[in-house]
Amino acid sequence: MLKRHKFATIFFGILIIVMLATTLGVAWFYHNTRTSNPHNYNIIGDIPVPYGYERIDGNDAAYSTFLRSLPLKGKGAKVMLYTGDTANYQFLSYAVVNLPILSNAEQCADACMRLRAEYLFQRGRYGEIRFNDVNKKTMKYTGGSSRKEFEKYLRKVYDVANTFSLSRELQQRPLAEIQPGDVFVYAAADRTGNQYGHAIMVVDVARNPRTGKKILLLAEGNTPARNIHVMRNLGHPFRSPWFTLDENADKLRLSVFRFNANELRGW
């Protein structure tokens, strides 16, 4: 009888430990795969790279630094629409970039142009702030250091530029040469049966020096206009938000979007 009692005690003890571990595991999984900015990072550069990887800069190291310095909203922050409503599908966002939305037209391609323009404006490179509209007409910024004029210019750009103009304006870049600031972009006109195009910006790149493998942090805006946010990697929740890049792939699945390899562009 004593042996049975001892066995039962051990059995139920193990069962309790397993149940507790399972509960904690589920809670941890939910916290890290559903909570926005679960570790309360301050900037994109605070998001750690997986073991064995090292961050790499692009041709313009200052641009890489700028993107990594983008501020993030705190733990639990939601992606909000320009209208003030909460966006649907919050689980697609890993962290919200702390930048105000400038207009109801600031959508996916506009978000990419916004980040590029913000970098050039911050560096005082005003003459380089220019984007093409859908008719290939170049819209040049002429407002100098005035923040008011800068935002006014961007709102005008948003009204006449989109994924179509952005995909034509930027230069195609091979996947093997990907760098921070690059853009995955396709226009609706490039996809049979597609009503909308989409654009996603590469905001960070890391490389494993031993294997040569690269991983990416991605950010996007979307329709309707909403906060720019770092995307969650739904396919690898334990590595979220880093996406593994297959440089030999013809097609890439980035969250819920699919891109062709030849749809990577650089400035």
Can you annotate each of these PLM segments?
Residues 148-214:
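...with weaker cross-activation on analogous glycine-rich loops/strands in unrelated enzymes
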Residues 29-89, 102:
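N-terminal module-boundary/linker segments of secreted carbohydrate-active enzymes
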Residues 215-217, 221-267:
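Low-complexity, Gly/Ser/Thr/Pro-rich intrinsically disordered linker/tail segments
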Residues 18-28:
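Hydrophobic alpha-helical membrane-insertion segments, chiefly the h-region
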Residues 72-75, 84-89, 168-172, 192, ...:
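Mature, folded catalytic cores of secreted/periplasmic enzymes
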Residues 2-19:
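N-terminal Sec-pathway targeting helices
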